[in-house]
Amino acid sequence: MAEVKYEPRLKKEYVARIRAALQEKFSYANEMQIPKLDKIVINMGVGEATADSKKPTVAAADLAAIAGQKPVITHARNSIAGFKVRENMPIGAKVTLRGARMYEFLDRLVNIALPRVRDFRGLNPKSFDGRGNFAMGIKEHIVFPEINYDKVDQMWGMDIIVCTTATTDDEARALLKEFNFPFRQ
């Protein structure tokens, strides 16, 4: 009996509709030139890690719940006396999502988390890096449905970087608009 493989909703939509729309808009010569999502990197910097070394572990547990994948604890590369940071001190957590988990996270981010952000007026359309990647920040991690608001003792912020295979910002912006990213006008 053949095993049925799960395919995320947004990936099905990309294959069925978004690729054709981008091909029509930019008229690529080759199908492999059509931009697609490469990876999503989520980073949590924990500023309070200098006072309490257990904070990055707590942040990593929350990040694991949000991403559905075990994060890596990040360490300081060098000492900074002004911030009371020593070399190799744990200062945050990060996770890189690819494949099905990436599409599932993107679905939750766009349809559930971003509408729950307080005073949200849309994403900044200038947050592209010039090479087709988009970066954004979220100030409170409780906007994700996986986090129980009653059990949270501290709010964490996070950086979310969406990496695409697009070569220009216009191509990446068109790709993310097709995925319903709410860019402000």
UniProtKB/Swiss-Prot annotation:
InterPro entries to which the protein is assigned, alphabetical: Ribosomal_uL5 (IPR002132), Ribosomal_uL5_bac-type (IPR020930), Ribosomal_uL5_C (IPR031309), Ribosomal_uL5_CS (IPR020929), Ribosomal_uL5_dom_sf (IPR022803), Ribosomal_uL5_N (IPR031310)
Gene Ontology biological process terms, A to Z: translation
Gene Ontology MF: a single term: tRNA binding
Keyword line: Ribonucleoprotein, Ribosomal protein, RNA-binding, rRNA-binding, tRNA-binding
Pfam families: Ribosomal_L5 (PF00281), Ribosomal_L5_C (PF00673)
GO cellular component terms, A-Z: ribonucleoprotein complex; ribosome
Subunit structure: Part of the 50S ribosomal subunit; part of the 5S rRNA/L5/L18/L25 subcomplex. Contacts the 5S rRNA and the P site tRNA. Forms a bridge to the 30S subunit in the 70S ribosome.
Function: This is one of the proteins that bind and probably mediate the attachment of the 5S RNA into the large ribosomal subunit, where it forms part of the central protuberance. In the 70S ribosome it contacts protein S13 of the 30S subunit (bridge B1b), connecting the 2 subunits; this bridge is implicated in subunit movement. Contacts the P site tRNA; the 5S rRNA and some of its associated proteins might help stabilize positioning of ribosome-bound tRNAs.
Family to which this protein belongs: Belongs to the universal ribosomal protein uL5 family.
Name of the protein this chain belongs to: Large ribosomal subunit protein uL5
Organism: Rhizobium rhizogenes (strain K84 / ATCC BAA-868) (Agrobacterium radiobacter)
Gene: rplE
